UniProtKB/Swiss-Prot annotation:
CDD domains: M48B_HtpX_like. It comes from the Bacteria. The gene is htpX. It is found in: Cell inner membrane. Its cofactor is Zn(2+). Binds 1 zinc ion per subunit. This is Protease HtpX homolog. It comes from Neisseria meningitidis serogroup B (strain ATCC BAA-335 / MC58).
Amino acid sequence: MKRIFLFLATNIAVLVVINIVLAVLGINSRGGTGSLLAYSAVVGFTGSIISLLMSKFIAKQSVGAEVIDTPRTEEEAWLLNTVEAQARQWNLKTPEVAIYHSPEPNAFATGASRNSSLIAVSTGLLDHMTRDEVEAVLAHEMAHVGNGDMVTLTLIQGVVNTFVVFLSRIIANLIARNNDGSQSQGTYFLVSMVFQILFGFLASLIVMWFSRQREYRADAGAAKLVGAPKMISALQRLKGNPVDLPEEMNAMGIAGDTRDSLLSTHPSLDNRIARLKSL
């Protein structure tokens, strides 16, 4: 629940900060509906796009991932060769491959585009899983890259953020209007922030739902690439090993929650396994 709260709080905080900065600069949302919608889009997409462009840098710094430029061990060479082979099957430029030190088995993919991406695995993943299972995990992350999930998630977040800002301003405009047609600036700003937080929470449910669907899709992509048995085996292995990632990276990891929830970024491992068995 801590991860979920921080995920929601971070997105809402970004919206609030951007609004405050624009207000300080004298850039406001007054005007017609078209102007308000344009203003809302600027606010809604700015944070998401910046996060996307900086995603590889943030990911590396968050977990201390070390990119493999020249393999130093047979295991590193195998990782590079496996990712390169999978990238060819997707007709993609080979992503950067990195390892980060963590006892928990996990992996994630990120990047600004399908041909500018990063796939990172933990030392715990390499220690706890067989080569077949690691291959399946890499295929799952490659499916995220090939499906363009990072970009799509950014666009969805930007769209919902836009409507969060737009609707909160519309309601604030109605509530803050005085009988003589004037408007209380303080009331307008306060009401818009309150509704922005409320709508931000509700909008996050949409983003979480999409995140869960993309996990099913990535599992299916991995099954197509390496076979469902390998992917099922990898997920079953994860069930016995609790995992953790920094809060800002959780949506990109492979591990899921023990139960389904509207606020989960991943479906439960049991449901993912059941979905794979039905393919």
